[in-house]
Every structure is written in structure tokens, then in C-alpha cells.
Amino acid sequence: MSKLDGKVVVVTGASRGIGKAIAKGMALEGASLAILGRTSSLSDPSELSIERTVQEIKDFGGIAQGYFCDVTEDSSVNSAFLNLREELGSVDVLVNNAGVLARVGFLETSISLWDSIMRTNLDGVYFCTMAVLSEMCRRNSGVIINISSSRGYSDDAQSTAYAVSKAGLDRLTIKLATELLGFGISVNSLQPGLTMTELMAKKNPDLLEMSPKWTEEKNIIPACVWLAAQQGTAVTGQVLDERDFGSTWPIKGISHPTIS
């Protein structure tokens, strides 16, 4: 029996990058995936799309459905979650992955850019989390994984708005976990390592040679699967680094899925 058999998992921002890798990894463990994103092959002819992620999951026998969702608009979020519940059932696991990054210092950050980053990285998490909490509270079970970033605590002079949004996300994680302790819902932040995504590799191939610290998208999968598969709230309200998975936080008895 796979670790996530019978689970319905929603991953936002899953048409590409880390979100896509997480979705495929969850599907390999038996979960039914709702792929949420804004990049559709109908509007963007590129190969990185909701439809492609869904097809790649189905190609290895997994279960997945795709839904257009702009996490910055509550009406779009509510519509996507209404549709996915009708097709896949109640949500067991929510992975808030959708996010935007701008490498701009504070002095160069316009009001519109600030609003755009906060709207996606914080408001989007609020909208999607609110969309699942009622059913999770009724069932007294559920898992919420917020994909964060160590940039929230770095001294990098750039990406100020992004750093603020991710630090805020981690604080939201801690407060929400405390509020939901009596409902059997775990809420954790997970920080990936410095990740070379598929899109970045295509646009900036020279970046791979500039730093030895790049990690692959798929490296976050074991940590995500472990968090999604845990029962109850033994681990909740934590800001976790996926690079420490297996050393400073537990994986006993958990084997790692492989993904191409």
C-alpha cells in the first residue's frame, strides 16, 4: 500500500517547477491530484502547463485533474475548489506552493510590485486555506503544507518584498497551527533548497555553473510526502528545511519515491 492511497491532494502553482515535482511525487504515492495553476496550453503554447502536468501523472498510472486557478482572486479559488471537490472529493492535503519572486531591493519596489507579491504569496495562501478549512475541521483531520523560503531570514539586499512575504507566511503557519490544534490539522512551512527549476534552466543555463548549491526540484518530494502522510499533529507549527530531512527531523520507516 502506498503512503497516500485514497488521499486527495491539491497543489497550487503545479504547472511547473517545484509544484509540478511535488504533484508528481504525491501521485506516485497513490494520491489523487488536483493540479492548480494559471498556465494552460489553451492560453500559453509552451510545454509547461496544467495539462502537461496532468498528462505526465496519467502516463505513469496516476490520478490527476487540472483546474485553472488564479490564487490572487477569491472567486477563482472558490470556483476551482468547487469543481475539484465534485470530481475528486474532499481535500485531505493542501500544498500552498504558488508564489512570485522579484529580485528587487526595497527602494526600487513599486507599490504595484509590492501588492502583486503580497497578493500572491500571502493572500493566495489565505484564500486557498480558507477554501479547505471548513471540511478539514468537520473531519478533524487534514494537512496543510506551505512552501516557504529561507530568503525570509537571509541578509540578501535584494528580493525584499519576497522575503517579507515568506517570513509572513512562516508566521501564519505557526499561528494557524496553534489555532487548529484541537481539530487534528497539521500546518507546516517547508523551505526548499536553492532550486534550479525547469524554466530557470531553459532561460538561464549559465546559472548552473555559477553556484554549486543548486538542488533539483524533485529533492523536495520525500519531505512533502512525509508531511502529507503523517497522522494527526505530531509535527505541526514548524518551519522546516527540506535539506535537513533525515537528519534533524524524522523519516524513520519512510522510503523515498523516485521520479523521472
Label each region the model flagged:
Residues 2-88, 102, 257-258:
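Short-chain dehydrogenase/reductase
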Residues 105-106, 113-115:
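Substrate-binding pocket helix/loop in short-chain dehydrogenase/reductase
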Residues 109, 155-163, 175, 203:
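Active-site loop-to-helix junction immediately N-terminal to the catalytic Tyr of the SDR YXXXK motif
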Residues 129, 165:
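Active-site helix of classical SDR
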Residues 134, 178-179:
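Alpha-helical segment proximal to the catalytic Tyr-Lys
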Residues 149:
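Residue(s) in the substrate-gating loop at a strand-loop-helix junction
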Residues 182, 189-190, 205, 209-260:
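C-terminal helical subdomain
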